[in-house]
Amino acid sequence: MKDPKVINGGVAIDARGSVTFVNDFDFSGVKRFYQVQNHRRGFIRAWHGHKKEAKYVYVPSGSALVGAIPMPEYVYMDEIGGDVEIIPGDKRPEKFVLSSKSPKVLYIPENYANGFMTLEENTIVQFFSTSTLEESLGDDMRFDFDKWNIWKEDFR
């Protein structure tokens, strides 16, 4: 897969309780996972990307706004005297709202940067990675949280 993709899930409820599931999610290729919980609503963790690592994102509690964008390519231009950033296809970040009330897994492909903002208190975001920690640390790029500023409130 070359673009972000949402894998939908569901909730089954009966007299015994509920079961939350994403049955079409395949763990093949996942090497590790980690879980993030911010200390407050509206906290932003962004932007972070990898050339070789893909991720799957799941929110088991609360909700989060997740952004994904192709990684910039850098070209050194001697006549300008610095690096020039080129975004493939001049893309804007794609935005996804993940919520425990509507279970789904978001696939973020390799060569993408991602970030998220918690929309509720006590939100938990789980990341499933296709790289080991050692592989990930050698393939890590970070960008300022407001580089692709998608974090504004959307009052409709």
Give the location of each predicted region.
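Non-catalytic, conserved peripheral segments adjacent to functional cores
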Residues: M1-K101, E121-R156
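Conserved metal-binding segment of the jelly-roll/cupin
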Residues: L98-E121
